[in-house]
Amino acid sequence: MMRSSSLQKNIMLLRVGSKDSTRFRILILNFGPQHPASHGVLRLVIVIIGEVVTKLDPHIGFLHRGTERLVEEHSYMNAAVFMDRLDYTTVLTQTHAYCLAVEQALAKSRLCIRTQLLRTIFDELSRILNHLLSIATHALDIGTMAMLFWAFEDRERIMELYEYISGARMHTALYYPNQTLDHILTNELLAKILIFSRNSEKTYTEIYIALYNNRVWRLRLCGIGVVSTEISTSTTISGPVARSTGLQLDMRSGENYQYGYYASLTLRIFLGISGDSFDRFIIRLRELFESTRLIYNSLIELSAYINISVYNMCSYSNNPHLKIESLIELFRYSLGEYLLNISLVSGFVESGKGIFGIMLAANNTNRPYRLYIRSPAYMHLQLLPKLGAGHHIADLATLLGSIDVVFGEVDR
């Protein structure tokens, strides 16, 4: 990103008018950090000639909370809740990355197939939450309000599932390193997830019918914010932004890296052709259907590995998590009595925005020595100066909506 001083120097290179004219018609605008279309506290210093953007300088840091530093002051168990506060539109996938890093440092994990399946199910529910909000707010920025009401109906159903299993609608604190999820398994939970997976496709179809062939929607998105294949291979972009260029990059289907239960599921990766905003919209919309299919297949697999009557929370005599031994182990773990050997580990997941990663340095204590967060939205935000130059100022809202930026994980 350019600093404001270098931006002021480059302004002098822009001339408007006749060859003999020495006057400069340059207008510098501040877009944000309180603009409703900035998707958070983003400030853009824009240099325009007429309505065409010639220079773009993003400024971040207005939401900095020092998460990477705060984690160093808490035990491995207690630090997991900080991950929920980063990208608050897809909370569970980020906590999953942290759990993978800590479990790698433990060198052994007692997680059963049931827990891996449940993590996969709730990761896909978080992806649906993210894509629904991304498409709805993007359409709202363009001028379509109906998508917001349709999308939030399904988001409400998912948040009711979160509330059922954890008591919280957004920051669930559901995943913890090396901890199973058997205690949340009930007949009612699986029935709720199954009903949602069958009924949600109606909303996705309505969004497709309303937007795909909409002339205004296509005019505002097609050819806007084109990311070339060279940029996708030479930068650190990921997720729908990278896949819109034709780059097949998805951590769920990696040959050298697998997590959750994705290795046993059939995953379809959707790629774009032109790399513009419309391709990114189509990829997110198709991933909504794909996530629903993965949830349904995971429920089928889960039914083969579990006897619900044994792990039902209502059957107190059969629930192992209600025994005193499990309670003592949980207290010891939460108090930080578990030490991790000196190691440098990492955990990566495919979140709704792209590859989210946690790099962790352990030093034989009960808390991290150092933690680094790889935010996909931060990587995508660096594309704005290239994508915005040459477009009209009205297209900035389209660009921001198509790269899907949330500043909880950008500033962190």
Swiss-Prot record:
EC annotation from Swiss-Prot or TrEMBL: 7.1.1.2
GO cellular component terms attached to this protein's record: hydrogenosome
Superkingdom classification of source: Eukaryota
Family note: Belongs to the complex I 49 kDa subunit family.
Compartments, as annotated in UniProt: Hydrogenosome
Enzyme's top EC category: translocase
A Pfam entry, by short name: Complex1_49kDa
SUPFAM superfamilies referenced in this protein's UniProt entry, alphabetically: HydB/Nqo4-like
InterPro entries recorded: NADH_Q_OxRdtase_suD, NDH1_su_D/H, NiFe-Hase_large
Molecular function in Gene Ontology: NAD binding; NADH dehydrogenase (ubiquinone) activity; quinone binding
Reactions accelerated catalytically: a ubiquinone + NADH + 5 H(+)(in) = a ubiquinol + NAD(+) + 4 H(+)(out)
Keywords recorded for this protein, A-Z: Hydrogenosome, NAD, Oxidoreductase, Translocase, Ubiquinone
Protein name (database record): NADH-ubiquinone oxidoreductase 49 kDa subunit
Function: Transfer of electrons from NADH to the respiratory chain. The immediate electron acceptor for the enzyme is believed to be ubiquinone. Component of the iron-sulfur (IP) fragment of the enzyme.
Keyword Flavoprotein applies: no
